[in-house]
Design a protein with these regions (language model features):
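Gly/Pro- and small hydrophobic-enriched strand-loop and loop-to-helix capping segments
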Residues: 210-224
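Conserved alpha/beta-domain cores
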Residues: 1-200, 206-208
Length: 224
């Protein structure tokens, strides 16, 4: 597994698809290291990656401790309220804010303002977590009461399908909703970012203006 080579190939694809979508800025690549060892995560760091994503408490703590201090740590998975206190002040971004109970606990435990993505279930699948697209505005309005939460953007996970036009339509819907929220000029919810696209569909997300793509197996492989 050559992480440097993988990153170069991913960046080439991102550049190609950003040009195709008339997007001037390439998305940040988050190395999703939940299935790999600390050594492999270090390979990603040495290849130039600075954004790392974990979705399990144990893995997050191990990687956070082992990697250099200049990394940007993203917690990208669903977070149980009882585990908020162990995570929230150790991360730079939280990608899965999807319920008020969680927002309340984050606000209570946070020692500073936390950069959060509201997770949106754009596809409407029962198996997917997230706020329904039609409920995003109302959900974000209710977050105004929580002084330690800053809604920096929206996040979604597309379904596993070969139908690229369908996936693109979902990413377009998220982008449109982001633009709608951004236009409201809310101090607590600037909503300038988009977290979307994984190993199978990051190229489509790039075309639609993703700010962050979350790439695991295609970048660092899978060891566990």
């Amino acid at each position: 597994m050559n992480v440097q080579y993988n990153l170069e190939q991913i960046e080439k694809q991102l550049k190609t698809h950003c040009e195709k979508g008339n997007i001037s800025t390439l998305p940040n690549v988050i190395a999703v290291t939940k299935y790999v060892t600390i050594d492999r995560a270090n390979d990603a760091y040495n290849a130039g990656i600075r954004h790392f994503g974990e979705n399990r408490l144990e893995g997050f703590q191990l990687k956070k401790e082992a990697l250099p201090d200049d990394i940007v740590m993203h917690f990208i998975g669903s977070l149980q309220t009882r585990k908020v206190k162990e995570v929230i002040n150790e991360i730079d971004y939280f990608h899965a804010l999807d319920r008020l109970k969680l927002a309340k606990e984050i606000n209570k435990r946070a020692e500073h303002k936390i950069k959060c993505f509201v997770q949106v279930n754009v596809s409407g699948e029962d198996s997917k977590q997230g706020v329904a697209l039609k409920d995003v505005n109302t959900f974000i309005e209710t977050l105004e009461q929580y002084e330690n939460i800053e809604v920096v953007g929206l996040m979604t996970m597309a379904p596993l399908t070969d139908d690229e036009s369908y996936i693109k339509s979902l990413f377009q819907s998220l982008k449109n909703k982001r633009d709608e929220i951004k236009a409201l000029n809310l101090n607590y919810a600037p909503c300038t970012e988009l977290s979307m696209g994984m190993s199978n569909d990051f190229h489509l997300a790039a075309e639609e203006g993703a700010s962050f793509v979350r790439i695991g197996t295609k970048l660092v492989g899978k060891e566990e």
